[in-house]
Amino acid sequence: MTEKENLGGSTLLPAYFGEFGGQFVAESLLPALDQLEKAFVDATNSPEFREELGGYLRDYLGRPTPLTECSNLPLAGEGKGFARIFLKREDLVHGGAHKTNQVIGQVLLAKRMGKTRIIAETGAGQHGTATALACALMGLECVVYMGAKDVARQQPNVYRMQLHGAKVIPVESGSGTLKDAVNEALRDWTATFHESHYLLGTAAGPHPFPTIVREFHKVISEEAKAQMLERTGKLPDVVVACVGGGSNAIGMFADFIDDEGVELVGAEPAGEGLDSGKHGATITNGQIGILHGTRSYLMRNSDGQVEESYSISAGLDYPGVGPQHAHLHATGRATYVGITDAEALQAFQYLARYEGIIPALESSHAFAYALKRAKTAEEEGQNLTILVSLSGRGDKDVDHVRRTLEENPELILKDNR
């Protein structure tokens, strides 16, 4: 099976974001992608579909999610500036993370297409959990591919998926992480697409997946924009979200992209440091290439081979990134920065200690950047409003954090009061 770009025919929606995106897939998958794109366009133009989706978002997922202003952080120093940090609470979505937003959309779409089986991949287990609960709700078979390493470090989510009736398949090949789970899911879909829908969990993959995922997640920024205007009377100065594959971030950025006065920042996993060889900062430190059917930035070695990515957070441990993020970086519309494991762990503890919220380690990367920007603003005499996508809750990470801090006591938060 060879992979080549789909050069035949045209797509209904733009397949590229600048030079990034496309459909670099086996020819046997092109009919499935064409069918999916047509079904998505038809569905989003259907008032009945939009009404049904809106009902699930409201009555099952609990949308709109709240906007919480951090009120107890010990930030104020000697500077004359003042920073306000607001959290868009995607951790309060049913399922525990932003993932369920677009999963409900895709499962409804799959049912509309007559599919009876859903295939998914998962890293931290949040996407797999969201897919499993949506399939349980709508009576569809669910198969989840998960890297063997991730199965080991995310046992609670594995059991949750199984409770919902999903079959979880550990992937031992390669590095045993998210990249390898995606490969196996794509192989399955290639063989079974007549009855199966591949529910991709991030804003990457071949067209039309990046567009579908963005559109179903755009509700995050649509709500947040309205909430910020109501609460503060203006748009935020900075919007920050963590970026692995980039789904929560593109949902958080989407409605702000045309607002040039709003700075967009993606927090990538710098792991043990950008020079350590152990990180997943694809845009900050990667090269352009093709992975999982799309042209974007990748973690690649000097031979051009895709490298293993690394992050303390399983959900950010992906060696590629969505093509729209690559385009936002290339055009300068968004900035992408590396946040280390140590910085994320500090932010995790900070939010728990001072605001009573336990964030996912993924979200902790975004919050760590917000803390840095807030401190700098106050030192430099700036007044700054920062909006953070709190993309998921941290229940799944508590044991991992506890073990890590026991092994590295120097990272335990010192009380700043």
UniProtKB/Swiss-Prot annotation:
Listed EC numbers: 4.2.1.20
Classification via InterPro entries: Trp_synth_b_CS, Trp_synth_beta, Trp_synth_beta/beta-like, TrpB-like_PALP, TrpB-like_PALP_sf
Pfam families in the cross-refs: PALP
Modified residues (N6-(pyridoxal phosphate)lysine): K99
Molecular-function annotations in GO: tryptophan synthase activity
Top EC group: lyase
Keywords linked to the UniProt accession: Amino-acid biosynthesis, Aromatic amino acid biosynthesis, Lyase, Pyridoxal phosphate, Tryptophan biosynthesis
Catalytic activity: (1S,2R)-1-C-(indol-3-yl)glycerol 3-phosphate + L-serine = D-glyceraldehyde 3-phosphate + L-tryptophan + H2O
Needed cofactors: pyridoxal 5'-phosphate
Cellular component terms per the entry's GO annotation: cytoplasm
Pathway(s): Amino-acid biosynthesis; L-tryptophan biosynthesis; L-tryptophan from chorismate: step 5/5
Function: The beta subunit is responsible for the synthesis of L-tryptophan from indole and L-serine.
Summary of subunit composition and partner proteins: Tetramer of two alpha and two beta chains.
Family of the protein in this entry: Belongs to the TrpB family.
Protein name from the UniProt record: Tryptophan synthase beta chain
Organism: Corynebacterium glutamicum (strain ATCC 13032 / DSM 20300 / JCM 1318 / BCRC 11384 / CCUG 27702 / LMG 3730 / NBRC 12168 / NCIMB 10025 / NRRL B-2784 / 534)
